[in-house]
Amino acid sequence: MEKKAKMSNKTFKRVWITVLSLVLVLAVAVNIAISIFESYVNNYLGYGTYEIIENPNTSDWDSQYYKLDYDNANGALNAALAMSERVEAEGIVLMKNAGVLPLQSGASVTMLGRDAADSVYGGSGSGSVDIDTAVTARHGMENAGFRVNQTVYDILSAYASSNAKADIVMDNPSASSYYIGEMPVSGYTGNAVASFAQYNDAAVVYIGRGGGEGGDLTCDMQGWDSNYTQGQHQLELNKDEKDMIALAKQHFDKVVVIINSSNAMELGELENDPGVDAILWVGSPGQVGFNAVGQVLSGGVNPSGRTADIYPADFTKDPTFVNFGDYAYSNINGGYFVHYEEGIYYGYRYYETAAAEGFINYDEAVVYPFGHGLSYTDFSWSIAGQRLGDVDGDIEIDVTVTNTGSVAGKDVVQLYYSAPYTKGGIEKSQVVLGAFAKTKLLNAGESETVTLKMAVEDMASYDYKNAKAYVLEKGVYQLLIQNDSHNLKDDISAISYDVSATVTYKDGRSGDKIPVTNQFDDVNVLFTDSKQDGYITDFSRADFAGTFPTAPTAADMLATEAVVAGFVPYNAAAVNAESDVDMPATGIQSGLSLIDLRGLDYDDPLWEVFLDQLTIDDMLTVTLNGAYHTEVLKSIGKPATTELDGPAGFTSFMGNINCTSYPSAVVMASTFNAELMYEMGEVLGNEALANKINGWYAPGMNNHRSPFAGRNFEYYSEDPVLSGIIGEACVSGLASKGVYAFIKHYAVNDQETNRVNNGVAAWVNEQALREIYLRPFEITIKSASSEMHYFSDEEGTVFTKNIGATAVMSSFNRIGAVWAGGSYPLMTTVLRDEWGFEGYVITDFNLYDFMVPDQGVYAGSDLTLTFTPMKSMQDATSAASVTNMRNAMHNILYTTANSNAMNGLVSGAQIIRHTPTWRFVQIGADIAIGLFLIAGVLWVVIRTRRYKDEVANV
């Protein structure tokens, strides 16, 4: 047998040197990448554990400032699941009922519609829900005792698995799709139709629409629907859905429609169809919410939700319709914008006012008012008392609610006010929600008295043109106890409140820390009273027809010189050169630890001594590396913190911690139950404690300006008062467990289109800005409160104090031409100076050039939501820059000190950080690779010499 030829030295060395070189280069590259993106790796694989070395003199102090209310993490999880179902149960809105609901328990039903098998649970992006662990629509029905038609369900499931429906791809409209995806009625085969007879107690028809981060729903379905009709949009029923409704009416005596959407839809056709017996809105139910849907259908739960948005008959006639979407200046590269031409007149504020002025026929224009919702029982109301304070006081109205029906239920009482309006004067809506209250569960015949309370000054309007202040004009204000935004409760007359003299709040209102006046004249200047090329017309009640919003013209798309200048990138050197501040002290150790500052006032002098300890590197380490965490600073006893995203619970698509997925924020708002939202905040706080979470990138406080906005599922409502009260309750509940909630996105982040394309410029006049878009944030900042505990002497005495909201997230968009996160008037003057906010602001995800960290810390955005080294400071050494970073650190550290991040820490304790497990794996891999390389080199040397010897001996 011929002996196989041995590889030559030349070939052998070429092969092995190449292999060893590639391994070496790859190993070095991976280690360099890990070093650069260490914070990103930490976010996914873990930051490592921390050990607290107690001060022996304080070993008997109870430093668990916030305690888990359950025995273990499983207890917290089970409580969260129960709360999630409870929120859905109270948020479901019975829109229509011709006496068919509730269905009989144990009824045999047929579920129709793709959405029955392919439901909407949340939204895409940060609002996604793990559907593998979710209770499905079918399971919810079966858990409530219904028998479900298996034949039809299997057909729907198979169709859904092989046919596309709408899919919003984050910040990539070209990759997104907008198919309704409903199965044509031809898909209901002969066998399917034959099966109806065995499951004919009711047809339950599911209609679904989903939203998502980074994209809006489409206002024109051309190209996305094979049966497209001119002007068809995504939020109306398409032909396949209408055919399905017709099929249900043909074969079933009872037809119930489930609206599985957090975006309002055009439902007039269903409401006016006598063959559709009931309509139930369920929003996006989250992880277990479909259990509650089944319970409402069976009568186990009496629905008590109310619509958080108005439901117009024709969205294309809405004043926001033409000014939503993709518009850009022709003379600015990346100059995208949106005109809020409607001002304060959007949602129910427009429809109620336009009807009062005779501009529209309300019954034709509106399907369901804001605040609408039916029940399985009846209620009567009566005024039990009223206390009408003076203009510096409060209005309180007591209403006794009695269940006059035969089953237990809850009711919602709504207080609106109608302010006197002078044609051509300050713009005013015909009605505005002032307060609301929800009863407890009232048994048949049972009564409860609820109190509706609001400050008189809350009825003031903001006059951005003349007084440049809030103004409570003289005249008679009507206080209206209503079922919804349109209908007075039977037998309850309006209450008159007389303001004898106009009050102009030049010194601010009672809740303002400084006088309030115009801060956004660079935006206001673009608004005019009549139509002019290049300007925005104020939509006025004085002439709805003549000032009705129109789409931007070519002239409007030519930016003025001032607007062009506003888009010029931030120049830190130029701005800082104008500053005359002195270089602050750095690196001066005083022995203080962060725990020593817990409980101290924000402006306590000890903070300055403490901050003197920081080095510039400390400041850069924290402020430029804030994605989903803040960094540990052992030198000052600052622990690392963990912050998670997810608008409906800690369910972020970034990181490896996932908790309960709650129903969408719209469902939360639709409960009209602030007490429930506080309890939900407490339960969320327990989940946070069980999972070592310190902060939450939520709740979302933006408004439903347009039903087409992709992130409406993340935001509560069109109404700022409802949003503010619901949000404040949730924030306070979370704070009771030491969790700081980042109310977001501050501010005017009401569409997704072009959000990251250099920041879409939102042009909104200051009246609408303050009364509508800033109002939910203002209510939460001024009202949120929770008791905290701390030690303040050497004896271990426990002190308590109240602390408010301590975290805010800014937004991608611009206010006018200025990036919101870099707007000093927005981030400092309004937020901190006027409202008194104490805490820190984090940017939205900071990957884009227009979001400059220097501009952020100058304006009051303290932490950059990004991973090192994605962003850097233009100027990190000047006195102005260091002062700005020091202020940012003050804000960040104040929030941290007064949070659950300090659990286990007392004065004198030390923090030891343990290396994360993944780092040991990396070290082990490096050692193994190193040994392999050494062995490889030795083998090459040995083999080469041996081969030479063999050749020499031949």
Which residue stretches match the model-derived regions?
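Short beta-strand elements
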Residues: 488-511
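Glycoside hydrolase catalytic-domain context in secreted enzymes
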Residues: 1-464, 473-487, 511-954
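Extracellular/periplasmic metallocenter environments
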Residues: 468
